[in-house]
Amino acid sequence: RSRISMDNRMIELEVKNLNKRFGGLHVLKDVSFGIKGAELIGLIGPNGAGKTTLTNILDGAIKPNSGTVYLNGQRIDQLPPFEVAKVGLGRTFQVTRSFRRMTVLENLYVPALAKHVAADKTEVTNKALEVLDFLTMKHLRNEYAQALSGGQQKLLELGRLLMLDPDIIILDEPFAGVHPTLMEIIYEYIRKVNEEGKAIVLIS
């Protein structure tokens, strides 16, 4: 499999005293933690424990009632998701969010070109093919995303993160509903991406 080269940047995430309420329900109460460097951490808890709420705050989908989140020295808890992604945080979702009417290859290079407007399309496409080779999906490059299995959809979402090159990757239930033959690829993805300098947060 191909080696996906990444910049080895110093990563620092600081979450401090986060609180989130929905009406009278206090979902997050004074949550604090930090990540330094290429750490691999797990966020484990039962349904309703607030894992998704925390993730939604980290990626800018919702705002906390109080508390702060800093990534690489920049405050991100008041930024919209696309700005958080530019700072360096990416995530997958329990329900995959591919562009179903685009091909697998287009699903990778279109978001990357949107983020890096000045990028050369040929260079980005070549990187997308390299990513698909790493995920053993190169043979599916011209298939429409809507034709993929649930496990292949998860791999495609992981590939999109590789293209966007975040410093911190949050994987929400990455093994849920995945065929055992694809689990090995996801394990390898986590190992290599973490080994090459990315911080990984696994949610289960």
Q: What does each of the following model-derived ranges do?
A:
Residues 109, 121-140, 188-191:
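Conserved ABC ATPase "signature" region
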